[in-house]
Regions:
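Conserved alpha/beta cores of soluble small-molecule-handling proteins
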Residues: 1-197
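Conserved small/polar residues in nucleotide/adenosyl-binding loops
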Residues: 198-204
């Protein structure tokens, strides 16, 4: 990718060639589908929009000195996504299908994997959303699992250098006995006020 400065990438979104999708309907998961579209169509009453039926994961692919592409312990991410699904009553995706989707999307976007020792990586974002239309708090009957990728630089530009930390005592990321042990979007939405405040004061890690 001659137009990408691999050593100066931010941790943000960059369009790549393909994403992979899979739908849960009639009590079972379908086959993996490949799409080049960045857009998804969902019903206005989908449970992901109203009742928070959404989970996601994050992992990276790296290119080694030998030119091979490696992803570290993707099965553990698949298991954690299953745990998130159980936590908010979504359909569980088999770990084998999760791994198949990861391998497929990385292969399809191989040209976006940064070179060895560039300091960058191919970030992999699996996510699942409730698609079924519901008015009333109940689980959806249909779900979509998808994976997209984007090349990224380090999350913290300072790398392993010491970072200032801001502890916010006025906000909770997740309630006790709630969803704090699973990876769902609501946990992160609850931090946005605190994050906005600390961005006004100093570059920090928010706890």
């Amino acid at each position: 990718m001659e137009n990408i400065n691999w050593s100066d990438l931010s941790f943000g979104y960059m369009k790549t060639d393909y994403n992979v999708r899979c739908y849960y309907r009639d009590g079972k998961w379908g086959e993996l589908e490949v799409s080049s579209s960045e857009i998804i169509n969902i019903h206005m009453a989908a449970t992901c929009l109203h009742y928070g039926q959404e989970s996601f994961e994050g992992l990276k692919a790296f290119k080694g000195r030998d030119g091979k592409i490696r992803v570290f312990r993707m099965d553990e991410n698949g298991k954690r996504m299953q745990s998130s699904s159980r936590g908010i009553k979504m359909a569980e995706l088999p770990v084998e299908k999760f791994e198949e989707a990861i391998r497929k999307v990385v292969k399809l976007n191989e040209r976006f994997v940064p070179p060895y020792e560039s300091g960058a990586a191919l970030y992999i974002r699996p996510l699942m959303i409730g698609l079924g239309a519901q008015v009333g708090v109940k689980p959806a009957l249909e779900y979509m699992f998808m994976v997209f990728v984007t090349p990224v630089g380090p999350y913290f530009k300072g790398g392993f250098k010491p970072s200032k930390v801001c502890i916010m005592r006025d906000y909770d990321r997740a309630a006790p006995q709630g969803t704090g042990t699973i990876k769902v979007g609501g946990n992160y939405a609850a931090t946005l006020v605190a994050v906005s405040y600390t961005h006004l004061t100093l570059p920090t890690i928010r706890l």
